[in-house]
């Protein structure tokens, strides 16, 4: 009996399906590394902070100014200055004095100041924004307790007014790369299995009529 020969070559559609699957697999792996580096690390640091009660001890400008970058159009950028205000609070978790910051981003941008205003071209507008923020903490908050966030292990001398990340960020960091990876694997596996079944069916058909 002559040896049966069955073609294992993929059709153009099958080849495109496998390439799409491999692309999704690679994209999922790369996305996981990119999201992990850009989002996961700061999000985990932010979520490690525990809620505490804080009360204001002092609000003052320290006489230093810092630069910020403003934009005034597509190709227009520049720098201006803003005064540094410090709000020291008593942290109920450690019962110690700590410097208040608006959020994790501002803490990393300027750990010396409590507030970074939206950067404007005119220094005067930046100063007014800082003054309004300073007066708010002096007059409206005063000695009233408020919720702050404290990380004993990372920065025990600082507290945050609000978190910039939550569990949703962690979910997205893992969910979409994993979905892309799983879909890619399924496409490749199903395409190969479908081809294998088609080849076996063709071989059985040839044996039947040989």
From Swiss-Prot:
Its main location: membrane. Glycans are attached at residues 53, 90. InterPro entries: K_chnl_Ca-activ_BK_bsu. The chain crosses the membrane at residues 20-40, 168-188. Phosphorylated. Phosphorylation modulates its effect on KCNMA1 activation kinetics. N-glycosylated. A highly glycosylated form is promoted by KCNMA1. Glycosylation, which is not required for the interaction with KCNMA1 and subcellular location, increases protection against charybdotoxin. Keywords: Glycoprotein, Ion channel, Ion transport, Membrane, Phosphoprotein, Transmembrane, Transmembrane helix, Transport. Residues 1-19, 189-210 are cytoplasmic. GO terms for molecular function: calcium-activated potassium channel activity; potassium channel regulator activity; voltage-gated monoatomic ion channel activity involved in regulation of presynaptic membrane potential. One of its GO terms (biological process) is detection of calcium ion. GO terms for cellular component: plasma membrane; voltage-gated potassium channel complex. Residues 41-167 are extracellular. It is found in: Membrane. It is a multi-pass membrane protein. Regulatory subunit of the calcium activated potassium KCNMA1 (maxiK) channel. Modulates the calcium sensitivity and gating kinetics of KCNMA1, thereby contributing to KCNMA1 channel diversity. Decreases the gating kinetics and calcium sensitivity of the KCNMA1 channel, but with fast deactivation kinetics. May decrease KCNMA1 channel openings at low calcium concentrations but increases channel openings at high calcium concentrations. Makes KCNMA1 channel resistant to 100 nM charybdotoxin (CTX) toxin concentrations. PANTHER family: CALCIUM-ACTIVATED POTASSIUM CHANNEL SUBUNIT BETA (PTHR10258), CALCIUM-ACTIVATED POTASSIUM CHANNEL SUBUNIT BETA-4 (PTHR10258:SF3). Resistance to charybdotoxin (CTX) toxin is mediated by the extracellular domain. Belongs to the KCNMB (TC 8.A.14.1) family. KCNMB4 subfamily. Interacts with KCNMA1 tetramer. There are probably 4 molecules of KCMNB4 per KCNMA1 tetramer. Interacts with FMR1 (via N-terminus). This is Calcium-activated potassium channel subunit beta-4. It comes from Rattus norvegicus. The lineage of its organism: Eukaryota, Metazoa, Chordata, Craniata, Vertebrata.
């Amino acid at each position: 009996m002559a040896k049966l020969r069955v073609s294992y070559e993929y059709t153009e559609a099958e080849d495109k399906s496998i390439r799409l699957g491999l692309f999704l697999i690679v994209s999922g792996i790369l996305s996981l590394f990119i999201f992990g580096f850009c989002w996961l690390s700061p999000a985990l640091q932010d979520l490690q902070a525990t809620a505490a009660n804080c009360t204001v001890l002092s609000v003052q400008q320290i006489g230093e100014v810092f630069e910020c970058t403003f934009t005034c159009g597509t190709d227009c950028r520049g720098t201006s200055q803003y005064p540094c205000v410090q709000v020291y609070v008593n942290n109920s978790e450690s019962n110690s004095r700590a410097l208040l910051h608006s959020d994790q981003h501002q803490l990393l941008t300027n750990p010396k100041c409590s507030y970074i205003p939206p950067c404007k071209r005119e220094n005067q507008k930046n100063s007014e924004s800082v003054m309004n923020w300073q007066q708010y903490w002096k007059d409206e908050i005063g000695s009233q307790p408020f919720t702050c966030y404290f990380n004993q292990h990372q920065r025990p001398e600082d507290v945050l007014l609000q978190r910039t990340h939550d569990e949703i960020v962690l979910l997205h960091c893992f969910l979409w790369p994993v979905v892309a990876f799983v879909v890619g694997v399924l496409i490749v596996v199903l395409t190969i299995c479908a081809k294998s079944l088609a080849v076996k069916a063709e071989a059985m058909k040839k044996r039947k009529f040989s």
